[in-house]
């Protein structure tokens, strides 16, 4: 088996099952890590701070979903990753995606660490979503 200790496999399975609102996910992950004796205080505090920052900007954070199974398909991502979606007449459409990639420049030959974040915004999809929702 990939993970020999069934207790560890159970914790991983429970963690990967966390999915729902971001606030609900934080609560579930805090409980899971506390019960398992895993210290994730700093990353969970960072996520809470991100949500608070979004709330201070007027973002409805109750509409932000979290899925522990989510990940971007690029190996250079090293931390927080995200996608922004909207719903159009044909269903969900991705508007943007990105994340943190602190080792990418070293992978490309930089001789020292360079922290980096970035995203791709699909402008034509954003404009189409705004038009569909009655925006300019």
Predicted features, each with a name:
Residues 1-136:
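Positively charged, Gly/Ser-enriched RNA/tRNA-binding surfaces
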């Amino acid at each position: 088996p990939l993970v020999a200790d069934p207790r560890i496999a159970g914790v991983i399975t429970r963690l990967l099952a966390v999915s729902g609102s971001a606030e609900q996910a934080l609560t579930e992950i805090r409980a899971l890590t506390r019960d398992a004796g895993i210290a994730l205080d700093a990353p969970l505090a960072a996520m809470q701070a991100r949500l608070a920052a979004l709330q201070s900007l007027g973002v409805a954070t109750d509409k932000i979903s979290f899925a522990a199974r989510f990940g971007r398909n690029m190996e250079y991502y090293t931390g927080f990753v995200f996608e922004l979606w909207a719903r159009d007449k044909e269903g969900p459409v991705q508007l943007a995606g990105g994340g943190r990639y602190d080792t990418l420049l070293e992978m490309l030959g930089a001789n020292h660490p360079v922290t980096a974040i970035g995203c791709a915004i699909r402008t034509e999809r954003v404009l189409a979503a705004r038009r569909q929702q009655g925006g300019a």
